[in-house]
């Protein structure tokens, strides 16, 4: 059995979202709505629903492969899903995760693997961690690779962090996050995912780096935008979900409608609700 149409043929009424577009949105205070997708069909759907950014996340290891962490995801797998997602994306800005082991060795390794993902259709790559990463970020940015950093709960470091725990709860931890964020912004990171940290800390990171586009997930409403895993916000993921997840399918008539509701809630500031989805 075959389909008579391809997601790549889906028309788009929107102009393509570029890094310049996102910076203009941030400058005028418009929130950025990001969501994960891993294939052409869902990419076309969320693109049509109006998301600004699509993240081909290494979360695919958990939501697609059924694994307990993201650590076993490979460059080959991210590349495959980036190519597939790119084919269904007409307007949204496409970001690809750099999987564990693809950038930690040295900046040259990072550039080689980032180049592979850009060739697969990514317009930006995302890498995790503070500390040692600014050198790598700067190396990539100077060579034309836009970078999204990732601080707070960094899933690739789950064992070093002792599990999926809130980061920056005490002042020492908060100060470390602020310091790492400043170093990454100074190194040229255009965007930064802030995951599982107190709202206060995320607000401070954004205030300290006004030109940086911070994207929250479990970091409160004070960031420049929000991201959720598609399967989480559709209620597909089984088991106990993190507090910061909201099921947008509850009142939706279709998956596309659920994603539209998510985009609207991010844009109007009703998601996340600080009393329900923040720490």
Curated annotation (Swiss-Prot):
Could you tell me the EC number(s) of this protein? 2.1.2.11
Question: One GO molecular function term?
Answer: magnesium ion binding
* Entry keywords, A to Z: Cytoplasm, Magnesium, Metal-binding, Pantothenate biosynthesis, Transferase
How many cofactor units bind, and how? Binds 1 Mg(2+) ion per subunit.
Top-rank taxon of the source lineage equals Bacteria
Q: Name one GO cellular component term.
A: cytoplasm
Primary location recorded for the protein, binned into one broad class: cytoplasm
Q: State which pathway it belongs to.
A: Cofactor biosynthesis; (R)-pantothenate biosynthesis; (R)-pantoate from 3-methyl-2-oxobutanoate: step 1/2
The subcellular location is:
Cytoplasm
Q: Which reaction does it catalyse?
A: 3-methyl-2-oxobutanoate + (6R)-5,10-methylene-5,6,7,8-tetrahydrofolate + H2O = 2-dehydropantoate + (6S)-5,6,7,8-tetrahydrofolate
Residues that hold Mg(2+) according to the record: 58, 97, 128
Active-site annotation: 195 (proton acceptor)
Q: Which family does it belong to?
A: Belongs to the PanB family.
Q: What does this protein do?
A: Catalyzes the reversible reaction in which hydroxymethyl group from 5,10-methylenetetrahydrofolate is transferred onto alpha-ketoisovalerate to form ketopantoate.
> Oligomeric state and partners?
Homodecamer; pentamer of dimers.
Protein name per Swiss-Prot or TrEMBL? 3-methyl-2-oxobutanoate hydroxymethyltransferase 2
